[in-house]
Amino acid sequence: VYVITKEEQREPVEKYLQSYPLENIKFYYVDIPNFYKKIFKGFMYSGRLNVWNRRVLPLAKKICTDQKIDVIHQITPIEFRAIGDYGKIANIKFVCGPLGGGESLPNGLKDYAKGHEIIEVVRSGINRWYRFKLRITGKLNHCDYIMFANRETRDFLGLDGNVPLVTEIAADEISIEEKTVPNDINNELVFLFAGRMVYRKGLDLLFDAIMEIPDEWKYMVKIVGTGPELSHLRHRCESNSLLSAHVQFMGAVEYSEMQREYEMSDVLIMPSIRETTGTVLIEAMSQGMPIITINKFGGAILVDENTGWLYSGENQKSYIAGLKNAMVACIVNPKEVERRGQNARKKVKDYTWKRKCDQYEKIYKRLNCN
């Protein structure tokens, strides 16, 4: 196996290899000028990735020739705007994905992007431009096998429903364990949000839903993370007695400490208004937590009525009601929370890294047999 990755990955990769030596794998590290790193940031990151892909292509061609490579798999990044030209290399099969990035704000939730409209408009324009480029260059036709991380991206690019949906995230088998810490210390249900506090994570939507739940009900919503929206969200809680009574800001929590947060919580809420999938979903499910999330994006692939609650809507009011109703269903029926949590842990066994590697290996072998 030959891996080409970014120069920024050299230190963590080599540190890992010192502790866990691997055979039959070789790493190459490719960098790009800092000029491009300064220009292409945030939602413009695809520009940086495409510069990197162009610099990688000659190296990939040489490795394919020298080592008689059978398959190239561009696994990351998952955004469709950054597909390389590796499918043009002679005598190899090109696997691409899972791809995301074609998601957009659902109708009814666009008000939650107030103050950030320019980002969504520019991003939408960039997506349409790259979709046009894919069509005129026929780049997707050079993919021997392609996967998508969510329906929204597949539909945006106009591919039919036979193209497989494969989540880009997975769990370590060792992390799929039975809960050992009871959550009912205070006889209240504990919801958990974990993620960066940016507008598209939907925390204002979550707060609007909380304000529809009767104040006297016993539950708590823990918010783990930090970000540019933190000040606004804190102020909103401090200004409302209902929110301040039911919302607790935990701040930034180290990854190594998140296990404890999962153990001390009952249900994970991911109220994102735009998301590819979200690693936190797999992490929570592996800890026996059911999920509440929108019936869109990658979460709609992972979660069903046996492992969590999916809410839908046609306008802002109905989305708020949908999220509120899902939370209420958890509060009034903790045994159902436990049942769906157990099912979530069972389901995540189909989404381990080993299972994913086995699936990829079958794809590679099938392509080479053909």
Predicted regions and their residues:
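A short, well-ordered alpha-helix in the C-terminal region of glycosyltransferases
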Residues: 336-350, 362, 366
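Short alpha-helical donor nucleotide-sugar binding micro-motif in glycosyltransferases
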Residues: 252-253, 260-265
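Nucleotide-activated donor-binding/catalytic signature segment of Leloir-type glycosyltransferases, i.e.
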Residues: 234-253
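Donor nucleotide-sugar binding/catalytic pocket of nucleotide-sugar-dependent glycosyltransferases
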Residues: 26-29, 96, 125-179, 186
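Aromatic "clamp/platform" in nucleotide-sugar-dependent glycosyltransferases that forms part
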Residues: 273
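Short hydrophobic beta-strand element within catalytic cores of glycosyltransferases
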Residues: 290-293
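Conserved donor-binding/catalytic core segment of Leloir-type glycosyltransferases
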Residues: 99, 183-201, 207-210, 222
